[in-house]
Regions:
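Secondary-structure edge/capping motif, primarily at the C-terminal ends of alpha-helices
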Residues: 87, 131, 191-195
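Helix-turn-helix
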Residues: 25, 33-67, 71-75
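N-terminal intrinsically disordered/low-complexity leader segments
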Residues: 1-21, 85-92, 225-240
Length: 240
């Protein structure tokens, strides 16, 4: 027979978030809402509901929707950097690094939404929404891309040319980098709805290998240099 003490429900202590933790939680929740509705289609009421807080608490951390959106932009740039990408970015500019970076970039863009992280999916949708609105979020994000990814790809193109691994090309090194980034982004957009818009008649591994070859050839890398540096099966370990 249970005593009164035994029958009493156990009350678990409520974990309260610090001000900084609460601010970060609001930003993470806002990322999903903004990615689904865009800036103009998102209300503070919807943001508060997603974050599980009151609108008053939202305004305690952010004076307005614009400030929350700006904070989210900064957070997106931070979240995009991870240990894996940092290892790739730390490599010295070379033909080998160029091949690794292009494989890494395209492999990430070809991950189906169902297999990607929630944050990654929200970021991609947010970029797509931004292109349909004023483009401000996309511009800020692309400045981050230019400072890191594009600058490193450009340096690798120049290093590969110096090593004799590039064909003569009238296309500037920086534009070669940007065009490959745009190509990879379009591959991502094709997958974004969950069911690809265009279904390629190739396995995921074959799609990746073909896309990497296409990108590297377009950048001007000689076929013999690609064959020497690119081992798709070994490179798959980068994104396994």
């Amino acid at each position: 027979m249970l005593t009164c003490v035994e029958a009493m429900p156990i009350k678990h202590p409520i974990t309260r978030l610090s001000a900084e933790e609460r601010r970060e939680a609001i930003i993470r929740a806002a990322l999903k809402v903004f990615s689904e509705n865009g800036f103009h289609g998102t209300t503070t009421k919807a943001l508060a509901k997603a974050a599980g807080v009151s609108e008053a608490l939202i305004f305690r951390h952010f004076p307005g929707k614009e400030e929350l959106y700006a904070a989210m932009q900064t957070e997106c740039c931070r979240l995009k950097s991870n240990e894996e990408s940092e290892r790739v970015m730390s490599l010295d500019p070379s033909t080998s690094t160029l091949v690794i970076m292009v494989h890494f970039l395209i492999a990430k863009m070809l991950i189906p939404p169902k297999d990607a992280s929630g944050i990654e999916n929200s970021l991609h949708r947010l970029l797509a929404q931004s292109f349909m609105e004023d483009g401000e979020f996309a511009r800020q994000f692309m400045r981050h891309v230019a400072d890191e990814l594009i600058a490193k790809l450009e340096a690798c193109v120049k290093a590969a040319a110096k090593a004799g691994d590039m064909i003569d090309s009238p296309v500037r090194p920086d534009l070669r980098a940007w065009f490959v980034e745009h190509f990879a982004a379009m591959l991502m957009l094709n997958q974004l709805p969950g069911e690809p818009i265009v279904v390629f008649k190739a396995s995921p591994a074959a799609q990746l290998e073909q896309a990497v070859w296409f990108a590297l050839l377009g950048m001007g890398l000689k076929p013999e240099a690609i064959r020497r540096q690119y081992n798709p099966k070994a490179f798959a370990l980068l994104t396994a």
